[in-house]
């Protein structure tokens, strides 16, 4: 029974991985290379240069440029110990992001996010990194909601998701209006597939949380049964699930 209920979340993660393989196989991945530094910003003052590959931030290994961005978003203004590779040599530096009052955010002063083509085995590897990134992000976001650092409105329901999909479709059609239909169709497919990677990974995590009426809640009762050696009375379990709904 545990394996049957756990199959749902596991399928969510598998779907996210398969779609990530397709997206990364066609579009590459955003390796954390520095494409450029901004004058008079902390990154330049700390010695970072175009072409550097950032490998860790404050001891946490990074494989995607987005991991740096999300770390800074969740730790605004925090000093960063950055490890990077230049000419096959590892270097370390420390910097404090600069606050931009106009945008109400902190910046290192680097830009990147370009997607780099990968070999087939790297595609599998970076697809795992992609799923891991989405899983870790949703877990940390949930933690920030419980601590009050993130509002509940940050999460979208079905209407919000539908609106996001519509916005993505319109963006592709507008930005590629002069491109061929096949190019627009491929870009739209990869864009939507990448979005489904995020949704599937998020659903996998949410369905494993011990929330009544969800898979995680049912798994919790089965684990209690396994420990006790007998099931929780059906009436009591039903009350908990109804309350959860």
Residue ranges with predicted function:
Residues 8, 207, 215, 240:
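Divalent metal-coordination and catalytic microenvironments
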Residues 30, 154-157, 209-222:
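Juxtamembrane/interfacial segments flanking transmembrane helices
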Residues 99-203, 220-242:
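Functional transmembrane alpha-helices
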Residues 27-44, 49:
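Alpha-helical transmembrane signal-anchor/signal-peptide segments
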Residues 43-65, 131:
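Conserved PDZ fold ligand-binding element
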Residues 1-33, 243-244:
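Internal alpha-helical transmembrane segments
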Residues 49, 55-56, 69-112:
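PDZ-domain C-terminal substructure recognizer with occasional recognition of PDZ-binding tails
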Residues 12, 16, 198-207:
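Alpha-helical transmembrane segments of multi-pass membrane proteins
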């Amino acid at each position: 029974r545990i394996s049957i209920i756990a199959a749902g979340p596991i399928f969510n993660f598998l779907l996210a991985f398969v779609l990530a393989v397709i997206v990364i196989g066609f579009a590459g991945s955003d390796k954390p290379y520095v494409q450029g530094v901004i004058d008079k910003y902390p990154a330049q003052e700390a010695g970072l240069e175009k072409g550097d590959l950032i490998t860790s931030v404050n001891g946490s290994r990074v494989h995607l440029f987005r991991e740096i961005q999300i770390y800074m978003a969740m730790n605004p203004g925090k000093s960063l110990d950055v490890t990077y590779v230049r000419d096959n040599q590892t270097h370390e530096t420390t910097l404090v992001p600069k606050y931009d009052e106009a945008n109400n955010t902190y910046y290192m002063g680097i830009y990147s996010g370009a997607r780099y083509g990968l070999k087939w085995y790297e595609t599998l590897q970076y697809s795992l990194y992609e799923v891991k990134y989405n899983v870790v992000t949703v877990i940390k976001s949930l933690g920030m909601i419980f601590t009050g650092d993130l509002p509940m409105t940050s999460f979208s329901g079905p209407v919000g998701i539908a609106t996001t999909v519509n916005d993505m479709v319109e963006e592709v059609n507008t930005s590629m209006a002069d491109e061929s239909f096949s190019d627009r169709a491929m870009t739209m497919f990869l864009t939507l597939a990448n979005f489904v990677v995020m949704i599937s990974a998020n659903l996998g995590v949410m369905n494993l949380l011990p929330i009544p009426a969800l898979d995680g809640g049912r798994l919790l009762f089965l684990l209690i049964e396994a420990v006790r050696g007998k099931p929780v009375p059906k009436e009591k379990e039903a009350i908990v699930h109804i309350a959860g709904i």
